[in-house]
């Protein structure tokens, strides 16, 4: 198995509207002989206009060999994804053989934003932002149709959160489906993404399953710019478990600018964000928000 395409920004210059775009992909040679190829990336803006074309180096893989290939380049006049501004680029990645023929290609919708966490604050594109929004059941259903909602209805309901002043949705307990994740990308709504959990920290095989699910969720959703927080559990987890969750993030999403944490984690230094339900409303180190302050259900 391979982990697919990973696209991320680096060397952000918000004022200068510049960012280095990086594209990576795991490639496996399943042929019986060595294969050589080059890795290319093309960037299209929201109107479909080509704004970047990056040529990678030549690679040769032996039979059965797996390697991560990379290409990067500077994007000028960049539009940065932000709250209420879901600007998305299309990145087309391509493997070409030495004779110029196409081996494989992937099209990825993504956006670029700069994040920073620390001193009790969260910065988005060099501006401190106070987190306020909604803790929504991941089913996100509507009366009459339940969870079987069309794409436009996902956009409508998620945009309602933005238009009401919310900049964050904390999905409850389990990872949201791709339609909602992509919808939040479009409407400019920050997401806190859980993997799958119960009401509290667990152990043994149940914890192993949560780790496995977080790995799969990160790989599946790491190109979606609206996901900024990875939630390790509905409530606090142990320091050891927090370190395990961060290790998964560091392995599969080391450059995505996302924080790993959980509610009730303000006393765990290794957590990168925290939150409470009642009474505690500030933090010296961890960015935090009141995660279930108003339980009008």
Residue locations for each model-derived region?
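Substrate-binding/catalytic cleft of secreted carbohydrate-active enzymes
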Residues: 155-163, 167-297
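Secreted/periplasmic carbohydrate-active enzymes, especially glycoside hydrolases
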Residues: 1-175, 183, 213-214, 228-229
